[in-house]
Amino acid sequence: MTKVNSQKYSKALLEVAQEKGQLEAILTEVSEMIQLFKENNLGAFLANEVYSFSAKSELIDTLLQTSSEVMSNFLNTIRSNGRLADLGEILEETKNAADDMFKIADVEVVSSIALSEAQIEKFKAMAKAKFDLNEVTVINTVNEKIIGGFIVNSRGKIIDASLKTQLAKIAAEIL
């Protein structure tokens, strides 16, 4: 499925949820389904042509048992339009669209040593200002190869203040 098509489905779900005043509840359901898909590899199951439509449809019926009316209608639309193989991608796109709407993002901070809680709070504040976000979750990744400094990555926007990069720039200027 193209990104444009998954965006259309996710936009439709978000619009209906907003109209019905159930946006927060739907986003919770979407997050739970994404987690369920990851833990049980359901995306691969739905995309695999070896399994019959009826087997895949049984999975959707199981999901419908605990879904809200809005989510049930959405899942039935996906099923009737033959998009079960794309459901995982559509759910991810829905989460991304909602994160954009509410200016929420995960921010990866790569550093040569683990960050303290105080440093994490400073990176949250910096990321909110630099990337115009309302809510930030900092994910600290330790990579000793950057020598010192840090690299901040949020949705493809990168701030590279690592010592390794600075040394490489100096070396390029000298040569």
From Swiss-Prot:
Gene3D superfamilies: N-terminal domain of the delta subunit of the F1F0-ATP synthase (1.10.520.20). GO terms for molecular function: proton-transporting ATP synthase activity, rotational mechanism. Pfam families: OSCP. GO terms for cellular component: plasma membrane; proton-transporting ATP synthase complex. The keyword Secreted does not apply. It comes from the Bacteria. Its main location: membrane. It is a peripheral membrane protein. The keyword Membrane applies. InterPro entries: ATP_synth_OSCP/delta_N_sf, ATPase_OSCP/dsu. Keywords: ATP synthesis, Cell membrane, CF(1), Hydrogen ion transport, Ion transport, Membrane, Transport. It is found in: Cell membrane. HAMAP family: ATP_synth_delta_bact (MF_01416). F-type ATPases have 2 components, F(1) - the catalytic core - and F(0) - the membrane proton channel. F(1) has five subunits: alpha(3), beta(3), gamma(1), delta(1), epsilon(1). F(0) has three main subunits: a(1), b(2) and c(10-14). The alpha and beta chains form an alternating ring which encloses part of the gamma chain. F(1) is attached to F(0) by a central stalk formed by the gamma and epsilon chains, while a peripheral stalk is formed by the delta and b chains. F(1)F(0) ATP synthase produces ATP from ADP in the presence of a proton or sodium gradient. F-type ATPases consist of two structural domains, F(1) containing the extramembraneous catalytic core and F(0) containing the membrane proton channel, linked together by a central stalk and a peripheral stalk. During catalysis, ATP synthesis in the catalytic domain of F(1) is coupled via a rotary mechanism of the central stalk subunits to proton translocation. Belongs to the ATPase delta chain family. This is ATP synthase subunit delta. The lineage of its organism: Bacteria, Bacillati, Bacillota, Bacilli, Lactobacillales.
